[in-house]
């Protein structure tokens, strides 16, 4: 899975657009072995030292379910399989593209977190939050997207202001290509 250790098998409950892992040992394992999810009782965790449940995004949940690490159920206890998770996200037209990028980065050994606070799709770490700063912010595009040059300048300025490299991730089928921009001063 590209992680530093193998998390123990976990189970969670699908609630809205996330999966909640309530078993603390399972939650800690998922977080410590890849920084999956967000502990609900800690704003900025410094490791797996938390006592509450773990909230996983649907992207994280699908990835972990595909890897056989996470079993998902509905609140009534009925099982939610991998295909059911894919069906649950059909309302988001960008989900497939985002998931392909997420999976590709995870398989390359990166820790992938939400990039919302940076105005992008993902923040990508080499080691993990609290250990190092995310050197990259990644935004997903399809080959059909028209990118305004002003958007490129905006992305460059934003990434420079937060000391990160801005990466365009473009998906074609299941393949992902990356283009990184950086400031150049002659």
UniProtKB/Swiss-Prot annotation:
UniProt cross-references to CDD domains, sorted A to Z: tRNA-intron_lyase_C
Broad class of enzyme this protein falls into: lyase
Any GO BP annotation: tRNA splicing, via endonucleolytic cleavage and ligation
GO molecular function, one term: lyase activity
Active site per UniProt: 125, 133, 164
Catalytic reaction(s) noted: pretRNA = a 3'-half-tRNA molecule with a 5'-OH end + a 5'-half-tRNA molecule with a 2',3'-cyclic phosphate end + an intron with a 2',3'-cyclic phosphate and a 5'-hydroxyl terminus
EC number: 4.6.1.16
GO CC list: cytoplasm
Stored InterPro entries: tRNA_endonuc-like_dom_sf, tRNA_intron_Endo_cat-like_sf, tRNA_intron_Endonuc_cat-like, tRNA_intron_Endonuc_N, tRNA_intron_Endonuc_N_sf, tRNA_splic, tRNA_splic_arch_short
Function: Endonuclease that removes tRNA introns. Cleaves pre-tRNA at the 5'- and 3'-splice sites to release the intron. The products are an intron and two tRNA half-molecules bearing 2',3' cyclic phosphate and 5'-OH termini. Recognizes a pseudosymmetric substrate in which 2 bulged loops of 3 bases are separated by a stem of 4 bp.
Binding partners and assembly: Homotetramer; although the tetramer contains four active sites, only two participate in the cleavage. Therefore, it should be considered as a dimer of dimers.
Family affiliation: Belongs to the tRNA-intron endonuclease family. Archaeal short subfamily.
Classification via PANTHER family: TRNA-SPLICING ENDONUCLEASE SUBUNIT SEN2
Name used for this protein in its record: tRNA-splicing endonuclease
Gene name of this polypeptide: endA
